């Protein structure tokens, strides 16, 4: 999977950009604030329908403009697609695949599997469980065709149940929901557990390469006692849940935990080690997708040089090159990119929203 061409209009300081990319490495250099991260953000938005920088879309649309537009030409093996996304200032989103309206953001996300590596991405390891659930659910979204619909239904039922609890309704009013909720909770949790176990060998192999001095172990926790039937637990805990106003236990509390030499990684690893572990996890997940589904991820890496020494940068670049994936990397100077020791690709200079291709 690769983006061969990208058109960006009215997206932050990228007023009118039309670029052709290499299917391997694409390097973006320029001063801070020049627009390097904005280009990564535009690519991410095309594949997710949201930003990794701002939750308010109006801040992304160029000043005094009614909308922004993204268009990409996508290639995978012998197949080609055109994808487009337009975000209006009043909030509407229009998504197109091969010129056809009526597509959902999930359709774009399925077509464009992406892995994002940023300095803020350490929340995967030192943030709350929701970040690690999202990590698992990303993989399941691309591995199980029915996962997304089950996940949406599960969250809808949880929202309805929590609303009923906060309104102090009796158990008889929500019992019918709990039957379906329990069924979906077990299905989603089983999928998560299976995926976590399937991913374990790739994680251990990649961590051994990046952090050979540490023994990294992983464990999945489904959000309630493993031996307990979830429907029974909902009934048992109803009075407690009603008193609190929301459902305390369940798949919405699941976690995927990481330890280094038996201790939580967020307590014992340096920021550099945490970044290496984050990179290892993203690479392992991308490689697992390739092994299982024969699909390449697109890797977006912002501020490549931060927290990593020269040896680790070269090691990461080597693994990315071996993966055969398309990679977008930002850095301040071309010298930082030379340390990656990548012989081919494309180099772009970004200067206040203007992007020029240079000789690599």
Please report, for each region that a protein language model flagged, where it lies by residue.
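Walker B catalytic acidic pair
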Residues: 302-304
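An accessory alpha-helical subdomain
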Residues: 121-210, 221
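Conserved lysine of the Walker
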Residues: 36
């Amino acid at each position: 999977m690769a983006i061969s061409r990208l058109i960006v209009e009215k997206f932050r300081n990228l007023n009118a950009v039309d670029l052709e990319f290499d299917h391997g490495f694409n390097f973006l250099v320029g001063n801070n604030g020049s627009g390097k991260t904005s280009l990564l953000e535009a690519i991410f938005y095309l594949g997710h329908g949201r930003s990794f920088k701002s939750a308010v879309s109006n801040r992304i649309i160029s000043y005094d403009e009614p909308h922004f537009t993204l268009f990409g030409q996508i290639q995978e093996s012998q197949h080609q697609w055109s994808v487009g996304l337009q975000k209006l200032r009043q909030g509407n989103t229009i998504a197109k695949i091969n010129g056809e309206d009526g597509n959902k953001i999930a359709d774009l996300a399925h077509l464009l599997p992406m892995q994002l590596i940023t300095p803020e991405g350490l929340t995967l390891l030192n943030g709350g469980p929701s970040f690690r659930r999202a990590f698992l659910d990303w993989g399941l979204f691309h591995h199980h065709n029915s996962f997304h619909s089950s996940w949406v239904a599960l969250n809808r039922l949880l929202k309805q149940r929590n609303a009923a609890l906060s309104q102090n309704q009796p158990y008889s009013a929500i019992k019918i929901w709990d039957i379906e909720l329990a069924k979906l909770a077990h299905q989603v949790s089983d999928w998560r557990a299976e995926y976590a176990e399937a991913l374990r060998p790739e994680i251990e192999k990649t961590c051994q390469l990046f952090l050979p001095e540490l023994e990294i172990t992983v464990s999945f926790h489904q959000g309630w006692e493993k031996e307990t039937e979830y429907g029974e637990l909902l009934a048992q805990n109803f009075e407690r849940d009603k008193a609190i106003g929301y459902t305390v236990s369940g798949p919405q509390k699941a976690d995927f935990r990481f330890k280094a030499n038996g201790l939580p990684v967020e307590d014992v690893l340096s920021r550099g080690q945490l970044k290496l572990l984050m990179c290892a996890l993203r690479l392992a997940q991308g490689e697992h997708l390739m092994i299982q589904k024969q699909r390449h991820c697109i890797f977006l890496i912002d501020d490549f040089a931060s927290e990593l020494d020269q040896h680790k940068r070269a090691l990461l670049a080597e693994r990315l090159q071996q993966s055969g994936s398309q990679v977008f990397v930002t850095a301040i100077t071309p010298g930082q990119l030379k340390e990656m020791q990548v012989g081919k690709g494309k180099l772009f200079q970004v200067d206040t929203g203007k992007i020029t291709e240079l000789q690599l």
